[in-house]
């Protein structure tokens, strides 16, 4: 009997289910799919690079043996992840790629040299993962996302230049590169150039040294869409500012689109020529703020779906509440959690992951009783009232704040927090936390009370140690 790839993999999985622990099977085997079987070679697609490494380094002998037994002959097993064979050195699929050392490429010329490949894969500097479809839009980024999409669809018309600013790790580079990808999908002949300010400066210095300024200017001014990242690093570089000013003018006057990213607005970049500030402000300045709780949860959920990882909602809520400053930190925490589960074989739960994310225990040494005591003190209710089922407004608000701070200051899971408050369901706890998050942004009095409790419990200082 000749087996198809799916049939063979199904038989192998049945055998592995009896040999492996349930956490190992559920984390690494169940999400793995068969991508092909031909000429004695079984190709498996792991859900993420960590799973791929685990399969290759620890589970491959068992998989090969079971596959060979099912086929009645030798079978070679190849494990892939993210459309590429995983090597043992692969650890982080979403790590930022190194800055390209070369000058920005002419995408049309690049495609002519490799006609069989997608434009996304050949344009120097563009990360294939930084596309609009992978960007989670929240209140913090809605305007920037809408402006980026408008620029990608109709460059050189509105919002020229588009200046995207925001703190580290909030998605500026993602949005900027998504513009380039989307533009190439609409118009494969478009000349799209993505460059960091550092690369622009280095190219300029190199061109001066080699007496190649004409080629430098021709290369940058030939772009239909120029994407310039980290423009704040132009501060104090007078000659670079001079050259960029003329490059900007040439493109703008020709109706070409310029998109700029910075960690601050133009007016706050020190030692930046006033005429450049004026040019940057003539279009649209779109600010990206830190994401709120709901957006952080959506980011983790989307990443989990993209990586085909089964994450408990409780763990998603924990990570989203624990890492609040930027998206890169948030995704880094998820990466560490997945790696930890991959290495140890432990299930992806708050209880197993939290100690790894805070190995000193200094960020989470507040007890539930301490939270209840301090909240009742600041909000002028009794601890007994907080733990009761009364719906009096003052008590309900104190109870919600208690749940919120218990999540902030301890490693208790949502069900455990619910148990602390008289057996409340975990969805009730989640709702309470989300309500407090929303109110903190619009209610200064509540924000002050919450901060007072935090100060008494030293929650923030513990996290910084």
UniProtKB/Swiss-Prot annotation:
<dbReference type="GO" id="GO:0005737">
    <property type="term" value="C:cytoplasm"/>
</dbReference>
<dbReference type="InterPro" id="IPR027417">
    <property type="entry name" value="P-loop_NTPase"/>
</dbReference>
<feature type="region of interest" description="Domain II">
    <location>
        <begin position="81"/>
        <end position="124"/>
    </location>
</feature>
<dbReference type="InterPro" id="IPR020591">
    <property type="entry name" value="Chromosome_initiator_DnaA-like"/>
</dbReference>
<dbReference type="GO" id="GO:0003688">
    <property type="term" value="F:DNA replication origin binding"/>
</dbReference>
<comment type="similarity">
    <text>Belongs to the DnaA family.</text>
</comment>
<dbReference type="GO" id="GO:0008289">
    <property type="term" value="F:lipid binding"/>
</dbReference>
<keyword id="KW-0067">ATP-binding</keyword>
<feature type="binding site">
    <location>
        <position position="171"/>
    </location>
    <ligand>
        <name>ATP</name>
    </ligand>
</feature>
<feature type="binding site">
    <location>
        <position position="173"/>
    </location>
    <ligand>
        <name>ATP</name>
    </ligand>
</feature>
<keyword id="KW-0238">DNA-binding</keyword>
<keyword id="KW-0446">Lipid-binding</keyword>
<dbReference type="InterPro" id="IPR013159">
    <property type="entry name" value="DnaA_C"/>
</dbReference>
<dbReference type="InterPro" id="IPR038454">
    <property type="entry name" value="DnaA_N_sf"/>
</dbReference>
<dbReference type="GO" id="GO:0005886">
    <property type="term" value="C:plasma membrane"/>
</dbReference>
<dbReference type="InterPro" id="IPR001957">
    <property type="entry name" value="Chromosome_initiator_DnaA"/>
</dbReference>
<dbReference type="GO" id="GO:0005524">
    <property type="term" value="F:ATP binding"/>
</dbReference>
<feature type="region of interest" description="Domain III, AAA+ region">
    <location>
        <begin position="125"/>
        <end position="341"/>
    </location>
</feature>
<dbReference type="Pfam" id="PF11638">
    <property type="entry name" value="DnaA_N"/>
</dbReference>
<dbReference type="Pfam" id="PF08299">
    <property type="entry name" value="Bac_DnaA_C"/>
</dbReference>
<dbReference type="InterPro" id="IPR013317">
    <property type="entry name" value="DnaA_dom"/>
</dbReference>
<comment type="function">
    <text>Plays an essential role in the initiation and regulation of chromosomal replication. ATP-DnaA binds to the origin of replication (oriC) to initiate formation of the DNA replication initiation complex once per cell cycle. Binds the DnaA box (a 9 base pair repeat at the origin) and separates the double-stranded (ds)DNA. Forms a right-handed helical filament on oriC DNA; dsDNA binds to the exterior of the filament while single-stranded (ss)DNA is stabiized in the filament's interior.</text>
</comment>
<dbReference type="InterPro" id="IPR018312">
    <property type="entry name" value="Chromosome_initiator_DnaA_CS"/>
</dbReference>
<dbReference type="GO" id="GO:0006275">
    <property type="term" value="P:regulation of DNA replication"/>
</dbReference>
<keyword id="KW-0547">Nucleotide-binding</keyword>
<feature type="region of interest" description="Domain I, interacts with DnaA modulators">
    <location>
        <begin position="1"/>
        <end position="81"/>
    </location>
</feature>
<keyword id="KW-0235">DNA replication</keyword>
<feature type="compositionally biased region" description="Low complexity">
    <location>
        <begin position="107"/>
        <end position="117"/>
    </location>
</feature>
<comment type="subunit">
    <text>Oligomerizes as a right-handed, spiral filament on DNA at oriC.</text>
</comment>
<keyword id="KW-0963">Cytoplasm</keyword>
<feature type="region of interest" description="Disordered">
    <location>
        <begin position="89"/>
        <end position="122"/>
    </location>
</feature>
<dbReference type="GO" id="GO:0006270">
    <property type="term" value="P:DNA replication initiation"/>
</dbReference>
<dbReference type="InterPro" id="IPR010921">
    <property type="entry name" value="Trp_repressor/repl_initiator"/>
</dbReference>
<dbReference type="InterPro" id="IPR024633">
    <property type="entry name" value="DnaA_N_dom"/>
</dbReference>
<dbReference type="InterPro" id="IPR003593">
    <property type="entry name" value="AAA+_ATPase"/>
</dbReference>
<protein>
    <recommendedName>
        <fullName>Chromosomal replication initiator protein DnaA</fullName>
    </recommendedName>
</protein>
<feature type="binding site">
    <location>
        <position position="169"/>
    </location>
    <ligand>
        <name>ATP</name>
    </ligand>
</feature>
<feature type="binding site">
    <location>
        <position position="172"/>
    </location>
    <ligand>
        <name>ATP</name>
    </ligand>
</feature>
<feature type="region of interest" description="Domain IV, binds dsDNA">
    <location>
        <begin position="342"/>
        <end position="465"/>
    </location>
</feature>
<dbReference type="Pfam" id="PF00308">
    <property type="entry name" value="Bac_DnaA"/>
</dbReference>
<dbReference type="GO" id="GO:0016887">
    <property type="term" value="F:ATP hydrolysis activity"/>
</dbReference>
